[in-house]
Amino acid sequence: MAVVHAEGNVWIKQWDHRFHMYGGQTCSPLMAGSWDDRTPLHDAALQGRLLPLRRLLSQGYNVGMATLDGITALHEACVGGHFTCAKLLLEHGADANAVTFDGATPLFSACCSGNPALVSLILTHSSAHHPAHLLCSPLHEAAKRGHTACVELLLSHGVNVDMELPSVGTALYCACEVKSTDCVLTLLILGADVQCGRGLDTPLHAACRVGGAKEAELLLEHGADRTSRNSEGKTPLDLTSDQSIKHLLQTAGTCSLSQLCRWCIRRSLGQKGLNKTKTLCLPHMLHNYLLYH
């Protein structure tokens, strides 16, 4: 029994990062600590071994074969960030919209890897829009992991920047929680609503809670309300112990008229409208000011 237990620990340790990736769900008690439902195709894709993958496909392995929890070889290639392997699988008919037991799509997995070329490839074979019934959002995952290029790609394909997931919040809120400064800036510039977070908890609440001074400063520059209260009646100032953030919140002065106008125009235009500002025939300097260039 001890031998079996030890062997199980080896397997769990080896694939621990994948349990984290897909939520750690086990479809059957018989499969606990085992990967017997995986095929050599899955292993080759995960490890980025192009030649073995090509050989297995030529031998007739089913490109769409999924494990009990719905993981396909394409998911594996995307998790590993292996562009050429994913391209080969797609050329052989892999389903770019396949969904795992935990709701992860190949696009979600590609965003986890942070490979923008791979994300772009998957987007040519699938929709960028996130199904309402899935909790695994590619945009949120890219934002949480600091993959700015992936965030930009998704938004350029029309993904809703202010999509709020239950108990998770918006992508901006997630980026503030992990202090991903570049992603926070990118999301704000590309039209994220600075007040949309998780329920009444705003991105500024999140940034102050985790001591994100740079994030808090960016949020204030884009019009965040430092007096807003969450469901517990707390303001961002109430949630921080960071002295630099406290100083920032307490000394923030009255905004200039030009700033107020910029925020008002940006909110009126929204995410889609910001992409069409060139049609407004504004002076070059004013156009750049509006877009924070």
Curated annotation (Swiss-Prot):
This is Ankyrin repeat and SOCS box protein 11. SMART domains: ANK (SM00248), SOCS_box (SM00969). Disulfide bonds: none annotated. CDD domains: SOCS_ASB_like (cd03716). GO terms for biological process: endoplasmic reticulum unfolded protein response; negative regulation of neuron differentiation; positive regulation of Notch signaling pathway; positive regulation of protein catabolic process; positive regulation of transcription of Notch receptor target; proteasome-mediated ubiquitin-dependent protein catabolic process; protein K11-linked ubiquitination; protein ubiquitination. Keywords: ANK repeat, Endoplasmic reticulum, Repeat, Ubl conjugation pathway. Disruption phenotype: Morpholino knockdown of the protein causes a reduction in specific Delta-Notch signaling. Its main location: endoplasmic reticulum. It comes from Danio rerio. Belongs to the ankyrin SOCS box (ASB) family. substrate-recognition component of the ECS(ASB11) complex, composed of asb11, cul5, elob, eloc and rnf7/rbx2. GO terms for cellular component: Cul5-RING ubiquitin ligase complex; endoplasmic reticulum. Gene3D superfamilies: Ankyrin repeat-containing domain, SOCS box.
